[in-house]
Amino acid sequence: MKKIITLAIFLLKVCCGNLQAQPFPSADEKIPFLCTFSKNSQKDWGDDDFVQIYFFVVPQTEKNPIYIRVFDPDIGGKYDEVHDVFNSKTRFSVYGGKGAASNPDAKKQTPTGNFKSGIQLSSKTFGDDAAYDDKWYTLGPFNPVEGELQPDGYVFKLIIEGMDGDDGNLYKMFLSSLPNENKAIEGGNAYTYEYSFRMADTKGSISHLYPFVSAGITAVKINVFDFDDDGILRVVSVAKKGEITKSSGNAVWLENTHKITTEELNTSLDIQFVKQQDSKNNNVVVYITNQYGELMPFYATPIGGVPKYKFKIGVKVDN
């Protein structure tokens, strides 16, 4: 297992040298919003634990201050999901230093134990506040070396917690080199081990997630919560034209196992959520593990690029 993790980190450094940090979720993912519900919400609204954890990677060569910007951080107004009346709060907290990203509790599917590991660098709680509705809020500045030094760069952890209330907070994020503008940091990226996001409302729309398959992985298990029978799950890769599985029902988990071929090693998968109904406000939670049960990160910018199926053309030889 250590060999798998070490090789994955090495390939991340090789493949990502020219990446530029993008919005989280990124344009490639075609996800309208990330979401976190407050702790008194019903789970059938689409959040299994009311906490989300995201990681932002800053290259070691970056010497200028960095910022984590959040779009629409309040919980009320234009985009957020109300239950009767808005009465909720959401807390955004940034952590750096030793253990922020490497502590095993920070990488669990369910946030328990010391998932707030590291040093808290910033924290802000939002309620129903028009001053932050449909606007960007900036956390920072942070010196890059305040993150935890990992092989792929300095890593900052952002924890979003649903506090009191029963409403859903929909938001986006950006790792930026400027406080008042979304300017990409060359070589930056972002990832999470569990994705909680809003599906698009339109029938036929497709959302994408991109886990990286490192050497040594023989199978992946894709776990989906509360897809509401809203469509199908399709897996595309350099070797898979589109393996289709059924979606999960309301407020339940569904696990699908997919074998990994040699051609798929050291590439990203394209996990597609294909919407087949014109239904609104469908929020989904997803995580993926390898054959050892280890969580695999989803990268905002797919490692090695968006995977494309490679058609194999057979040649018939006449004797």
Show the residue positions of the predicted features:
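Alpha-helical transmembrane segments forming the membrane-embedded cores
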Residues: A200-G204, K240, S247-N282
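Post-signal peptide N-terminal segment of secreted/secretory-pathway proteins
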Residues: I53-F56, Q60-N114
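Extracellular beta-rich ligand/substrate-recognition surface
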Residues: N40-V51, S196-D201
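C-terminal edge strands of extracellular/lumenal beta-sandwich accessory domains
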Residues: Q22-I31, Y54, V82-A100, D133-G249, ...
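N-terminal leader/pro-regions and domain N-caps
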Residues: Q22-G46
